[in-house]
Swiss-Prot record:
This is UPF0398 protein Sca_1081. Belongs to the UPF0398 family. It holds the Pfam family YpsA. SUPFAM superfamilies: MCP/YpsA-like.
Amino acid sequence: MVKTAYVTGYKSYELNIFKENAPEIKYLKAFIENKLKSLIEEGLEWVLIQGQLGIEMWTAEVVISLKEEYPDLKLGVIAPFENHIERWNEQNQIQYQKIIEKADFTESVHHAPYEGPFQFKQTDQFMLDHTDMTVLLYDEEQEASPKYFKRMLVDFAEQTNYTCDIVTFDEINVFINDLQWSEEESFE
């Protein structure tokens, strides 16, 4: 049974999403919500993120909204190092702080500022070691930063009994098409 899941994927700019009100976000959040609800019904208790912009932050927002329906659901934010948001613009820092305020657990893997890329790799390993499953939104057709984590994830899953769900754009598009179709049907 999956009690703790790590959800990660593209950063917003890797999806060419630069505004909080971009229509794509609505659909991605609906997809994430649908995925999480299925896991919650099977016993999911905790969702962990590292606090990256994009899929992870949208996941946090979804978890926070799901707490109304599932009050036992918990959100953990495990940053790779202290002050990892210091180079973000003010709007993104405010969004992050709102999530931190509503998270059930926050911590940094490294209790120091950025020292090198090894901190990201060690944090990725920490997430694998402390969760039962990863949901990774990543598609080989659009290579970006999650490709490094994907390699680590696949190797880890092959060596252990770890569960991974690598979500492609095809799966997301099928969900979006179904969602749009059901929205159109409800207006008739």
